[in-house]
Amino acid sequence: DDHVVEPPHLFQEYMQPNLRDLGPQLIETEKGHQVWEFEGATYRQVGMNAVAGRKPETVSLEPFRFDQMRPGCYDIDARIKDMDLGGIWAMLNFPSQITGFCGTVFAKASNHEVGIDAVRAWNDWLFTEWYSKYPERVIPGGITYLGDSDEAVREIRRNAERGFVSVTLPEMPRNVGFPNLWER
């Protein structure tokens, strides 16, 4: 179980060109922190989410900059080196702050096309830059679009066809608008 930190280029590179300006943007705050901005809300790269190799006293809940993080948090080649140092063979990844828990941030997007494309971009980035480079070491855990069950199924199937073996889902699907399984 491992978390990835989405790199600065993810959404600009992997979202459809006509939607990129509406997707998540990495911005710098007045205090010099780097945070994600999406639909008027900000999502911090919280220090507690990227603490590998840091002394506990240097960690806070303040947002980190990418140049303050260990590169293995967001770069797969550096991550593999870190895993080798720790004697770890494989990792099952989970997303970071910008997606929200299980992709809920994108499911709540006011423009569903943008939300769906952000989910696809995240999965395409994970597939292209992490899993494809180290398929024997990365157990790809995708996210899906939780705003529509049919779209969720399409994204899960799309990822399964290319080797994803897991998907991150909320433990209580009814909390994101899916039917309550116990009320059948």
Q: Which residues are covered by each model-predicted region?
A:
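Helix-coil boundary/capping segments in enzymes
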Residues: 2-184
